[in-house]
Curated annotation (Swiss-Prot):
This is Zinc finger protein GIS2. SUPFAM superfamilies: Retrovirus zinc finger-like domains. The keyword Repressor does not apply. Coiled coil: none annotated. It comes from Saccharomyces cerevisiae (strain ATCC 204508 / S288c). It holds the Pfam family zf-CCHC. A zinc finger (CCHC-type) spans 4-21, 23-40, 47-64, 65-82, 92-109, 116-133, 135-152.
Length: 153
């Protein structure tokens, strides 16, 4: 089962497509609007932690230890009794502020997307889906192609 919260009700354990709940604001937990239109101050009171599943805090504030090797709680990976696995997980980072251990919808920053870096052009302040610039190659940092098509690779 997915550790990510449902985008409709905010609860862990199912996906939005399977949710029967009325859509609630992710910030204040009330119907009729979404978080971006919420007039209430940002809060974690109704948010559900992706690490432990409890409400009232987000992953970056969670005190429950979770092993990145076996995904069990109570210990961290360097203390894990299971054989070490090659990690294919990327660290969670916020697309809004660039900070670690939380996602944009959990971000407490009010000042828009200033820390956001576009994956298409590499500039700050917008996301790839809104980019008007040419693609930037991660290999040579030139525009017009992506790394898999790089002539310098």
């Amino acid at each position: 089962m997915s550790q990510k919260a449902c985008y409709v009700c905010g609860k862990i354990g199912h996906l939005a497509e399977d949710c029967d709940s009325e859509r609630l604001c992710y910030n204040c937990n009330k119907p009729g609007h979404v978080q971006t239109d919420c007039t209430m101050p940002r809060t974690v009171e109704f948010k559900q932690c992706y690490n432990c599943g409890e409400t009232g805090h987000v992953r970056s504030e969670c005190t429950v230890q979770r092993c990145f090797n076996c995904n069990q709680t109570g210990h961290i990976s360097r203390e894990c009794p299971e054989p070490k696995k090659t990690s294919r997980f990327s660290k969670v980072s916020c697309y809004k502020c660039g900070g670690p251990n939380h996602m944009a919808k959990d971000c407490m920053k009010e000042d828009g997307i200033s820390g956001l870096k576009c994956y298409t052009c590499g500039q700050a302040g917008h996301m790839s889906r809104d980019c008007q610039n040419d693609r930037l190659c991660y290999n040579c940092n030139e525009t017009g192609h992506i790394s898999k098509d790089c002539p310098k690779a």
